Amino acid sequence: MARLYLIRHGKPSATWGGNDDDPGLDETGQAQARAARDWLMALPAAERPTRVVSSPLRRCRETAEPTAQALGVDIEVDARVGEIPTPAALSLAERGPWLRKSFAGTWAEIEGDLDYDAWRREIAASLIGRGNTAVFSHYVATNAVVSELLGVPQVLAFRPDHASITVLETDGVTLTLVEKGREATTGVL
């Protein structure tokens, strides 16, 4: 079995409703990215990641950068581990209320342009072949994977904190949850 690490991005410099729809990390987020790197690099060699994958969004790429540099590898950008797709008809101002409503329900109940239950299965399936990999992603995408692996329909399986590291194992055929990452004490929205 190979280890896979699903890391939520560090604290961004802006939140929902701000002027920047793709913010980078603030100083706290940069420190969190370095702490994630240090944790990953302290693992035994057999468990340490050899690849780095990131969501296309800047906050994830910036969180991934210290780990990629320490490993001497390039960041592989993969949209499949990106942010939950917002329905096309929603404005930026409507996204927060849509997310809050989505968080309160199940994957099958999310209203939008696609089958969000299928979306969560696709994210988990995309990770099966990624052993020995650090994957830098988002709050909702991390919940998609965890809820799929636990077999629960709720959107919120847990509340991953910024730069928390969820540990998974894969044999190339199946994906297993080893340990959820550190949980946040504050809300996302």
Label each region the model flagged:
Residues 12, 141-142:
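Short active-site segment of divalent metal-dependent hydrolases/proteases
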Residues 4, 50, 129-140:
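Generic beta-sheet signal
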Residues 2-77, 105-109:
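Active-site-proximal alpha-helix that buttresses catalytic centers in soluble enzyme cores
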Residues 1, 73-77, 83-97, 129, ...:
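Acidic, low-complexity terminal tails and accessory targeting/binding regions
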Residues 66, 144, 148:
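Active-site signature of alpha/beta-hydrolase-fold catalytic machinery across serine-
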Residues 97-118:
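Short glycine/proline- and acidic residue-enriched helix-loop micro-motifs
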Residues 29-33, 116-119, 135:
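Conserved anionic group-binding/transfer micro-motifs
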Residues 34-41, 120-128:
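Generic structural signal for well-ordered alpha-helical scaffold segments
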